[in-house]
C-alpha cells in the first residue's frame, strides 16, 4: 500500500498568464507527485466545469482560490490514509465528494490536478516511469507506442488575434521513422514557414499554441503557405508530411440561423454546405484528419460529414464528445465521427480519461491525446499517449516552452523504450492504414 499522507494545492500561472491549479500528493516513504490542470479557450458546452473565483479584483476574475481551497480542505481530508495505487478509488472518492455531474462543486481543475498528481506519486512509489504506471492502470502493461504528432503551425480562431476562422492548421511528419525525427521534420517546416510568411509580408507572431497567427486572404491560403513551407524544407507533401485541421466550428456557428459563417473570407455555409467545402479542401490538399468540422450540437450534419468523408479521412470529435463516455457511446451507436480527441480536463480525472480511450479503441475509433490552449510545463499528456499506445498526439507547434515540454518528454521516453515503443506514423490515423 502507498498511503497518502499529505495533499496540497496552490495557484500557479499558465501559458496565457492566467491562474491554474497545481497539486501535490505525498505518500509514506517520501514519494511525491505534482501536476497542474490545463485550461481551454474554445470549450465544449458539456465539458466538466473549470472553477474560477469570479473576483474581478484578482486576475480579472480568473483566480482559482476556491478550487485550491477544495483541494486543501475537503479533498485532502478525504484522501488522507488512502492507497494511491488504487487510482480508480481515489478518483471516485473525489467525484462522489463533489457530488455533481460536471464537477462544478470543487471544479474539474481541482479534481484533475489531484488525480494526475496521485498517479505520479503512485508511479514513483513503484519505481516506474509515469507512462509504465499508466499502461498498468490501462490494463495494458508493457504495451507502448510513440504517437504521431499533429503540429499546429498556423493558429486561428480562438487561439489567435487574426482573421483566420479555422482554429488549427497542422502538419503530421508521417515520413519519419521515429518520434525524434518527426520533431526535427516539424521544426524544419516551422522555420521554413516563417520564411514563407515573411516573404509575403505576413506577420510571424505566434498564437496560444506556438503556431504563426498571420492575417490571410482565406482559410485555404493557410494550407497553401504550409505546402510552400513543406517543399522549402525539402519534403514531399502527401508523402513525407500530411495535413490536419481543427475547425472548432462551434466558434463560427450561428445557432439561430443554423449557418457557418467564415467571417474572415465573407462566406456563409449551411451544415451540409460546410462539409462539402471541407471535402473540396481534401481533394486539393492531403488533409487526412479534420476535427470538429461542425458545431457540437449538429449531430445530423455530423452524420452527413461522416458518411461523406469518414471512409477517406479521420473525423475527430472534440467539442462533439468532450472526452465523455456517455456522449461518445451515443456517437458510436449512431456512426458519428470515427475518432475522439482526448483532453483530461474535459472530464476531470485520469480514470474517466482512460475509460474514454478504451471505449473509443474498442469501437474501432482512434483516440488523439491533446493539450489545451492554456498549458503549463506539465508534460503528463506525453506519458498518457505512450502509456495507452494511443498513436496520435496534439500538443502545439515548435515554439513556446509549454508546447515543447511535451515533445521533449516524448523524445526522452522514446530513448528509454527503444523498440518497445514503435512509431507507426500514418498507420495510426483512421482511414489511412
From Swiss-Prot:
Record-linked InterPro entries: Enolase (IPR000941), Enolase-like_C_sf (IPR036849), Enolase-like_N (IPR029017), Enolase_C (IPR020810), Enolase_CS (IPR020809), Enolase_N (IPR020811)
What does this protein's UniProt record list under function? Catalyzes the reversible conversion of 2-phosphoglycerate (2-PG) into phosphoenolpyruvate (PEP). It is essential for the degradation of carbohydrates via glycolysis.
| Gene name tied to this protein | eno
Q: Which UniProt keywords apply?
A: Cytoplasm, Glycolysis, Lyase, Magnesium, Metal-binding, Secreted
User: Which parts pass through the membrane?
Assistant: none
State the superkingdom.
Answer: Bacteria
Q: Which PANTHER family would you find in this protein's record?
A: ENOLASE
Q: Where along the chain is Mg(2+) bound?
A: 246, 291, 318
**CDD domains, from UniProt?**
enolase
Q: Name one GO cellular component term.
A: cell surface
Protein's name according to its UniProt entry: Enolase
Source organism of the structure: Tolumonas auensis (strain DSM 9187 / NBRC 110442 / TA 4)
Q: Name one GO molecular function term.
A: magnesium ion binding
List the SMART domains hit by this protein, alphabetically: Enolase_C, Enolase_N
Q: Where in the cell is it found?
A: Cytoplasm; Secreted; Cell surface
> Assembly and partners?
Component of the RNA degradosome, a multiprotein complex involved in RNA processing and mRNA degradation.
Instruction: Provide the residue positions that the database annotates as binding (2R)-2-phosphoglycerate.
Output: 167, 343, 372-373, 394
| Catalytic class of the enzyme | lyase
